[in-house]
Amino acid sequence: MSRKPIIAGNWKMNKTLSEAQAFVEAVKNNLPSSDNVESVIGAPALFLAPMAYLRQGSELKLAAENSYFENAGAFTGENSPAAIVDLGIEYIIIGHSERREYFHETDEDINKKAKAIFAAGATPILCCGETLETFEAGKTAEWVSGQIEAGLAGLTAEQVSNLVIAYEPIWAIGTGKTATNEIADETCGVVRSTVEKLYGKEVSEAVRIQYGGSVKPETIEGLMAKENIDGALVGGASLEADSFLALLEMYK
């Protein structure tokens, strides 16, 4: 089965509104065809509405970096999936290691978010990944499989087929370290095998799996050549228009 690549930037808590607007203006007319690749930027929630307006008519898709699992209520400071979808946003990133570590999000929280996002009409980008300690102990497969099983609990086969899963080894995020292409592919293969165990081969061959962790324009091509890697979730290299476009160059 042919899976369309998805290259997604994750800005985290960076940029001002004027910088975000300038970025969209710089990239929107220079992206490869969406027939070849999905080009996505994950931006702080404050910027999504003006970015969505500016990207009209272009190939650029947008992602929220988080959402809550309720659509309304007394949840001060949170953003609902329904409100995000109402802006025309296609994707919502959930389960990032920074959310798990700093905001104490659990697998159960992330699973609730996945269900709420699908119900609202967006697509989750579900993150998983292990610490350096887990990696060095040889327990990566066990750890990542556990995160996937918990994150997908109760989702339908159709939902999982449309899901994006991002494998990001925590020890390679923003550290300058990167997993070798072989390690990245092997662990993305673990993710795919876990999906197959839960939902069958057809679903596992449909789900798209990204690698994230210090991905750069000079390293992305080797990663994308691997069997189980269908895209990248990119932090630092997505912050500047030139480097984001360089990540997509092979698809032009």
Curated annotation (Swiss-Prot):
InterPro entries: Aldolase_TIM, TIM_sf, TrioseP_Isoase_bac/euk, Triosephosphate_isomerase, Triosephosphate_isomerase_AS
Superkingdom, taxonomy of origin: Bacteria
Keywords: Cytoplasm, Gluconeogenesis, Glycolysis, Isomerase
Pathway: Carbohydrate biosynthesis; gluconeogenesis; Carbohydrate degradation; glycolysis; D-glyceraldehyde 3-phosphate from glycerone phosphate: step 1/1
A Pfam family recorded for this sequence: TIM
Record CDD domains: TIM
Keyword Hydrolase: no
One Gene Ontology molecular-function label: triose-phosphate isomerase activity
Binding positions for substrate per the UniProt entry: N10, W11, K12, G174, S214, G235, G236
Gene Ontology cellular component terms for the protein in this record: cytosol
Catalysed conversion reaction: D-glyceraldehyde 3-phosphate = dihydroxyacetone phosphate
GO biological process: gluconeogenesis; glyceraldehyde-3-phosphate biosynthetic process; glycerol catabolic process; glycolytic process
EC code: 5.3.1.1
Primary enzyme class: isomerase
NCBIfam families, A to Z: tim
Family label: Belongs to the triosephosphate isomerase family.
HAMAP family: TIM_B
Function comment: Involved in the gluconeogenesis. Catalyzes stereospecifically the conversion of dihydroxyacetone phosphate (DHAP) to D-glyceraldehyde-3-phosphate (G3P).
Subunit structure: Homodimer.
The protein's name: Triosephosphate isomerase
Organism name: Lactococcus lactis subsp. cremoris (strain MG1363)
Lineage, uppermost ranks: Bacteria, Bacillati, Bacillota, Bacilli, Lactobacillales
